[in-house]
């Protein structure tokens, strides 16, 4: 029988999102304005900085900006990739956008991009999927990869055997046991599994994508915002589909 995927957290309801930007300008007070980023309504707080500004003052201004966003109803924020003051934002109740659901949803394109970069044909490739349980994204990735690659390895305690048996029955797939043939790519949906080949860690606040970078197929992203949290937000609120994404390999 078809194994049921384990519980999977549903992305939270989309709320007003903030942008915290350190901007070189005169003044001391953060300024809040409303804007749209790729169709998303956002509140941007401009935090004034200048060359030579002491670190403690910059952090204090970032805290003031975060507090202003929180009072306006913002709970999650986007920033530049190298934004230095996340602890100050978190101290005022803001948090980053969780990239895990998005990264796990695009596990298959990421795996295929890793194979292309390595020059490995799909029909000769072995891909491993690991995690602490058979989650919905892991199950979906396994079912999609079966017809596309030579071998799958399902490295999940307990539930993995049931999933492997179902894949063999449903697709006639060659599903190998963990610890055997070395995979070319490992898709890790959580900690604890064996990591061999090119390892894509699709979990946690900072997923490890082994130099692969999702980008928009058409049009660019704002250069002043970290791309992965923004793409995760667009995907979460239904403004982004897999067909609009291209995986750039570095």
Regions found by a protein language model. Name each.
Residues 1, 15-23, 176-208:
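Short, well-ordered secondary-structure micro-motifs within conserved domains or adaptor modules
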Residues 1-39:
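N-terminal basic/disordered segments at the start of proteins
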Residues 25, 32-34, 46, 198-250:
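Adenosine-phosphate binding glycine-rich loop
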Residues 45-65, 73-92:
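Electropositive, gly/pro-rich neighborhoods at or near active sites that engage anionic ligands
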Residues 79-86, 100-105, 130-137, 157-161:
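Gly/Ser/Thr-rich loops at beta-strand to alpha-helix junctions
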Residues 95-113:
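A glycine-rich, Thr/Ser-enriched phosphate-binding loop motif common to dinucleotide/cofactor-binding enzymes
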Residues 117-181:
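Glycine-rich phosphate/diphosphate-binding loop of Rossmann-like nucleotide-binding domains
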């Amino acid at each position: 029988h078809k194994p049921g995927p384990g519980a999977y957290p549903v992305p939270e309801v989309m709320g007003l999102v903030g942008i915290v930007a350190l901007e070189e300008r005169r003044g001391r007070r953060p300024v809040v304005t409303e804007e749209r980023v790729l169709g998303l309504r956002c509140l941007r707080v401009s935090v004034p900085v200048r060359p030579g500004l002491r670190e403690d003052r910059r952090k204090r201004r970032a805290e003031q900006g975060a507090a202003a966003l929180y009072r306006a109803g913002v709970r999650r924020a986007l920033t530049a990739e190298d934004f230095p003051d996340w602890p100050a934002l978190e101290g005022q109740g803001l948090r980053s956008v969780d990239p895990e659901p998005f990264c796990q949803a695009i596990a298959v394109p990421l795996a295929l991009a890793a194979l292309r970069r390595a020059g490995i044909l799909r029909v000769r490739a072995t891909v491993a999927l690991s995690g602490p349980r058979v989650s919905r994204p892991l199950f979906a990735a396994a079912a999609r990869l079966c017809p596309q690659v030579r071998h799958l390895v399902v490295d999940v305690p307990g539930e993995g055997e049931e999933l492997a048996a179902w894949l063999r029955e449903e697709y006639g797939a060659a599903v190998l046991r963990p610890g055997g043939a070395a995979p070319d790519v490992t898709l890790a949906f959580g900690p604890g599994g064996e990591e061999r080949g090119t390892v894509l860690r699709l979990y946690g606040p900072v997923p490890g994508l082994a130099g692969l970078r999702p980008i928009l197929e058409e049009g660019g992203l704002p250069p002043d915002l970290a791309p992965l949290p923004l793409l995760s937000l667009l995907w979460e609120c239904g403004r982004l589909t897999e067909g609009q994404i291209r995986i750039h390999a570095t």
